[in-house]
From Swiss-Prot:
The protein's Enzyme Commission number: 4.3.1.17
UniProt gene name: sdaA
Source superkingdom: Bacteria
Name of this chain's protein: L-serine dehydratase
Cofactor note: Binds 1 [4Fe-4S] cluster.
Reaction(s) the record says it catalyses: L-serine = pyruvate + NH4(+)
Phylogenetic classification of the source organism: Bacteria, Pseudomonadati, Pseudomonadota, Gammaproteobacteria, Pasteurellales
């Protein structure tokens, strides 16, 4: 079972597949060397990056992420402020301290980390790491795939289902299974997910994790609305959340313009995604590129519907996480595999479901909200300008946040049965993504990415 611990992970920007995943892969490689008793023999490390991971890698800080992973750091606890200085020293010395300084190996930034424009067979995001001894003889080589949302898998385990050692009370493979559990047991969708999570991780751990997820999201919004300036990279995109926040604070009277609610939702989403673009601390929800939608919709609920309680936060994230797990199991949450419908589309679907849940929707209405949100994201391309998670990504999160709220409201006010089910729209999304030309799947070779010139 895909857990909320998997769907919501604290990490750093700008990308879950191109930053968080590669950092975890680098750390995993070092851990493997230690397990194989080859750590001490290693004197040099070589990295080859392929496919979408390569084509947009520099804009997504993939190279930096891999190096930080090899250095022994993980996305959830790496000191963001030390990264630039650490990387600069590696560039100057051609030496890399690995496993938090336990050993120093040769690593020339230009020659030991190579971006290839070719694709590996198993997935669009591939990377191979090789350890060499003092004679430059290969000690160990492993290929990893970053399959979206910060998930990684090595070549030997690719495509193999990871079996839970713990039996959950409500196993499911699709939305139909979930709705049957809810109907048979008189449970809300979030309760079904909670009972499964308790079986896997224990109630205390689940509550602590979800509390930390929301606190991290809140901190991200707060930092975003108080930070101005230009985002990193050649696009020189100015931050907008702070100025929008000031404008909204200056006039809080909604009666003059009820649509100002949308401005607030936009601001929440922009704040989070600007933090992500700047390499800040964010939560994969389910990816970094789509990390603004779920927090923006919950922040909307808190400001305009009702104060948040720990129970409401948990129910929202559990329902959203459960819907996200269906996409992870039966389709993809990787922009490199299925386009932006797998990132912003999935986040929109998750947020719509979460909102419907805490607004009192029954399990069917929650699934209808998720379906509506995805249905109107089908075919969404991933064409980041300059290979960066900025244009169109930041604004797109704001648009999708509003769309999620609308999808939820439409589902709750529907009086007829839908013709399209959530399971069918998930299936359609995956097929659409696989049919999509590769230049629209996070390669920056089509769409806006080739129309907008980076100076």
């Amino acid at each position: 079972m895909i857990s909320v611990f998997d769907m919501f992970k604290v990490g750093i920007g700008p990308s879950s597949s191109h930053t968080v995943g590669p950092m975890k892969a680098g750390k995993q490689f070092i851990d493997d060397l230690i397990k194989r008793n080859q750590f001490e023999q290693t004197t040099e490390i070589h990295v080859d990056v392929y496919g979408s991971l390569s084509m947009t890698g520099r804009g997504h800080s993939t190279d930096i992420a891999i190096i930080m992973g090899l250095a022994g750091y993980l996305p959830h606890n790496v000191d963001i402020d030390m990264i630039s200085g650490f990387i600069e020293k590696v560039k100057q010395t051609a030496l890399l301290p690995i496993n938090v300084g336990q050993k120093i190996v040769k690593f020339d930034f230009e020659n030991n980390l190579i971006f290839h424009r070719t694709f590996l067979k198993l997935h669009e995001n591939g990377m191979t790491i090789t350890a060499l001894d003092e004679n430059r003889t290969e000690l160990y080589r492993q290929t990893y795939y970053s399959i979206g949302g910060g998930f990684i898998v090595d070549e030997a385990h690719f495509g193999k289902e990871e079996k839970n050692t713990v039996q959950v009370p409500y196993p499911y493979k699709n939305a139909e299974d979930i709705l049957k559990h809810c109907s048979d047991n008189g449970l809300m969708l979030s309760t079904v997910m909670l009972e499964n999570e308790i079986a896997l991780n224990g109630k205390e751990a689940v509550s602590a994790h979800l509390e930390n997820v929301w606190k991290t999201m809140q901190a991200c919004i707060e930092h975003g609305i108080h930070t101005e300036g230009i985002l990193p990279g050649p696009l020189r995109v100015p931050r907008r959340a702070a100025s929008l926040y000031r404008a909204l604070q200056a006039n809080t009277n909604l009666s003059n313009d009820p649509m100002r609610v949308i401005d607030w939702v936009n601001m929440f989403a922009l704040a989070v995604n600007e933090e992500n673009a700047a390499g800040g601390r964010v939560v994969t929800a389910p990816t970094n590129g789509a990390c603004g939608i779920i927090p923006a919709v919950l922040a909307y609920y808190e400001k305009f519907i009702s104060p948040l309680t720990p129970e409401i936060i948990e129910r929202y994230l559990l329902a959203a996480g459960m819907i996200g797990s269906l996409y992870k199991m039966n389709a993809s949450i990787s922009g490199a595999e299925v386009g932006c419908q797998g990132e912003v589309g999935v986040a929109c679907s998750m947020a719509a479901a979460g909102l419907a849940e805490i607004l009192g929707g029954n399990p069917l209405q929650v699934c209808i909200a998720a379906e509506i949100a995805m249905e109107h994201n089908l075919g969404l391309t991933c064409d980041p300008v300059g290979g960066q998670v900025q244009v169109p990504c930041i604004e797109r999160n704001a648009i999708a946040s509003v769309k999620a709220i609308n999808a939820s409201r439409m589902a709750l006010r529907r009086t007829t049965n839908p013709r399209v089910t959530l399971d069918k729209v998930i299936e359609t999304m995956y097929e659409t993504g696989k049919d999509m030309n590769a230049k629209y799947r996070e390669t920056s070779q089509g769409g806006l990415a080739v129309k907008i010139v980076c100076n």
